[in-house]
Design a protein with these regions (language model features):
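Ligand-binding loop in jelly-roll beta-barrel domains
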Residues: 27, 86-111
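A short, polar/proline- and glycine-enriched secondary-structure boundary/capping micro-motif
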Residues: 41-43, 77-79, 109-113
Length: 126
């Protein structure tokens, strides 16, 4: 099973970047590409402590990913493979491409909150 990142369904597309995602065989696959710095933290409001409760495994293709935890911060750069523990808030640097994998069962409740917040945000921008 495989596909091009361009063929993944879009969650978000805007001039500052895109976020594509699908679910295969119990795994969630995400591809993100951002031309500008992006802080998706506001999309996490409604989750405990406004932090993502799902673990992720990822690879930074280019750019930088900053992950903030309650007690520390981790920075991943191009070429880094990473494990992101639950209880985090991500931020993406300009010109960043990132691929992440998550257990779909753990990610679904997070995406329910994120989807509601994204829809509300998009309505205020209209």
């Amino acid at each position: 099973m495989h596909c091009s990142t361009a063929d993944l369904p879009a969650v978000f597309e805007a001039p500052q970047g895109m976020w594509r995602m699908t679910e295969w065989e119990g795994m969630n696959i995400e591809y993100m590409s951002f031309q500008q710095e992006v802080d998706p933290g506001p999309l996490l409001h409604g989750l405990p402590d406004s932090l993502c409760s799902c673990p992720h495994w990822g690879y930074v293709i280019q750019g930088q990913v900053r992950i903030t935890f309650a007690d520390h911060e981790e920075i991943y750069n191009a070429g880094d493979v990473c494990y992101i523990a639950p209880g985090h808030r991500p931020a993406f640097g300009a010109n960043t491409e990132f691929v992440a994998f998550s257990l779909a069962e753990s990610y679904r409740p997070v995406m329910e909150v994120v989807s509601k917040n994204l829809a509300a945000l998009q309505q205020t921008e209209v």
